[in-house]
């Protein structure tokens, strides 16, 4: 009897193991099926900036899960230049420079049938592979309490940020670390002109607490009170405005910054990726992008009774940025900013502090010394000379220029300090 019982238990145990294994296989198969339909979207935006859109998409019948890879533009370039590229299907970014790079390296699929309202916002050179689904604008994120503690009014524009009263109160990123910041810097250079634009940036540099590694890092640091104000794109600011200490104000001449979407040529889920883009461009998708939770504006015009319609119209009415020029002088602007500001920030702050102190003591401006601290070693004509700009693709040429600029800035700063000492 015991033998029969043991054999029965043994048989049941084997059936149980087989059943459990079958259930495990079924679960794994189901999981793999779900994973195989997952879209991987690489993006330069922060997770909070994409969460609302993805949540709403995933309530749609037949929608697939979206997993995001949130990285800098430079990091995504490196990732997507590799063979497997982590099986990325989509790119969501405000960086035309990233999309231009990917297109030149044959990484993007062709897209067609985009609405005219979308395509007119896309730089001509990437219109065959990219569509604009939303727009943003540039402005200043303000920490009211941080400024109030220093008895300072909020700055209204780039010019205000260079005032001596804002010493140690400002934050920004750099063009080499953030394409969003690059576009903001270019909007200033194109608005004011090359020479005046750099003079403004160099005056601001004396007031910076630090250079943030990410554009949304500027917003996070201002929220924490590390700085009182800084230039950001509106969608990062809008997501923080439930904090009563924070406010956002657009620059008077804020350029429009589109949000682009593109499909990777080697996407394993190209149909699903295109379905997501069609959803974003559909009336329903545009209504979701009009929601303040995204911090963006749709490309389709908002109705006149929408409280956000007036600002959308103001953004759309601004002259478009010269994207051809931005792409041609990308290396120049990035290297100039780092050489002029990022790599010598501590010395710059000392020099500007000395100048402001001297002007206060003497009760008069010192334009000659100020000119030494606000000049750059490249003239406006060269900044638009495509033949000369193309040489920056040669690493040796670019590094040689940076060495020359370092010496130029150092000599100017030494001369400025010498002249200030003579005034004592």
Question: What are these language model-derived features?
Answer:
Residues 35-101:
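Early extracytoplasmic/lumenal segment of secretory-pathway proteins
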Residues 51, 87, 95-99, 103-212, ...:
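Extracytoplasmic ligand-binding site segments that recognize negatively charged/polar headgroups
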Residues 69-79, 206-220, 256:
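Short helix-initiation/N-cap motifs at beta->coil->alpha
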Residues 96-101, 223, 227-245:
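A ligand-binding cleft/hinge motif common to bilobed small-molecule-binding domains
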Residues 118-122, 136, 170-173, 200-205, 242-269, 279-300:
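Periplasmic-binding protein-like
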Residues 141-146, 256-272, 288-289:
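A bilobed periplasmic-binding-protein/Venus flytrap-type ligand-binding module shared by bacterial periplasmic
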Residues 351-424:
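C-terminal non-catalytic accessory extensions
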């Amino acid at each position: 009897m015991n033998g029969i019982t043991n054999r029965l238990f043994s048989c049941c145990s084997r059936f149980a193991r087989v059943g459990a294994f079958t259930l495990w296989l079924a679960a794994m198969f189901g999981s793999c099926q779900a994973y195989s339909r997952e879209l991987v979207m690489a993006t330069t935006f922060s997770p909070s900036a994409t969460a609302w859109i993805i949540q709403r998409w995933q309530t749609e019948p037949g929608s697939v899960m979206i997993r995001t890879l949130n990285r800098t533009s430079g990091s995504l370039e490196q990732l997507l230049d590799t063979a497997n590229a982590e099986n990325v299907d989509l790119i969501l970014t405000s960086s035309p420079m990233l999309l231009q790079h990917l297109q030149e390296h044959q990484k993007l699929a062709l897209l067609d049938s985009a609405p005219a309202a979308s395509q007119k916002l896309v730089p001509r050179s990437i219109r065959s592979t990219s569509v604009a689904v939303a727009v943003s604008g540039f402005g200043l994120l303000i920490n009211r309490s941080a400024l109030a503690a220093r008895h300072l009014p909020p700055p209204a524009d780039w010019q205000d940020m260079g005032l001596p009263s804002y010493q140690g109160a400002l934050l920004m990123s750099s063009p080499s670390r953030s394409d969003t910041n690059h576009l903001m810097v270019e909007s200033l250079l194109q608005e004011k002109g090359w020479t005046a634009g750099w003079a403004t940036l160099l005056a601001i540099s004396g007031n910076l607490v630090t250079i943030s590694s990410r554009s949304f890092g500027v917003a996070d640091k201002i929220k924490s009170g590390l700085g009182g104000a800084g230039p950001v794109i509106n969608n990062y600011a809008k997501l923080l405005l439930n904090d009563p200490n924070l406010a956002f104000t657009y620059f008077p001449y804020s350029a429009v910054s589109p949000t682009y979407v593109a499909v990777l040529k080697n996407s394993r889920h190209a149909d699903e990726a295109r379905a997501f883009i069609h959803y974003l461009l559909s009336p329903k998708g545009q209504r979701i992008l009009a929601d303040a939770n995204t911090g963006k504006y749709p490309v389709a015009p908002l109705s006149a009774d929408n409280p956000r319609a007036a600002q959308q119209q103001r953004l759309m009415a601004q002259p478009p940025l010269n994207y051809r020029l931005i792409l041609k002088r990308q290396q120049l602007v990035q290297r100039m900013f780092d050489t002029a500001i990022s790599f010598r920030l501590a010395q710059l702050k000392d020099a500007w502090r000395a100048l402001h102190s001297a002007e206060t003591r003497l009760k008069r401006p010192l334009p000659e010394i100020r000119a030494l601290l606000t000049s750059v070693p490249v003239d406006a004509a060269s900044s638009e000379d495509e033949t000369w700009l193309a040489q920056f693709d040669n690493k040796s040429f670019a590094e040689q220029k940076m060495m020359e600029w370092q010496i130029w800035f150092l000599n100017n700063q030494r001369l400025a300090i010498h002249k200030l000492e003579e005034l004592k």
